[in-house]
Amino acid sequence: CPYYMTYSGCCAGNSDGWKDNLKPEYYEEFAHYLVDVCKHYKDEYGIEFRTLEPFNEPLTNYWSRNGGQEGCHFDISSQIAFLKVLSPILKESGLNTVISASDESVLSDSYNTFEGYRSAGVLNLIGQWNTHSYYGNNKDRSKIRTLSQESGLRLWMSETGSGGSGISGNLEMAKRLMNDVNYL
């Protein structure tokens, strides 16, 4: 999110990576900002995005002030609150784009976030469940697949990596991809 919407004044994250950085009073403005970007691409280039993902690895502590990459921690309750603001704005935009969430880096976090959304009754606000598969096991993958199937949401593995190089890194990447295909 733009720096002026944050607690820290920095788009790389809060001073404490475990704390939210987007101020709630900017939820509506940030939601309009995201939807305006989608509308711009449709109007200027004829590209309509299938999904809009407002979060990236939101439960992690990677995102800290003056870090090397922009990012923003969102507790599950903050994600839910933001989705409640974003959803009607996106629907009113006239776009066919749906919200995807929540791109957690850890499969168990993805599962817990999904359960949090379900408990809060907000799964109907999203059209696709995104997850990363950097960390976790096949049991976690299967749990996410089952939740997605039960809810009728499209499931999308949107990012992974092996963290290695050479043949060992390549073999690990192949293993992860095969596990994602077979268990997600």
Segments and roles (model prediction):
Residues G127-L184:
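Catalytic-core region of carbohydrate-active enzymes that cleave or remodel glycosidic bonds
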Residues Y33, F82, S110-T113, L125, ...:
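General structural feature for long, well-ordered alpha-helical segments within catalytic domains
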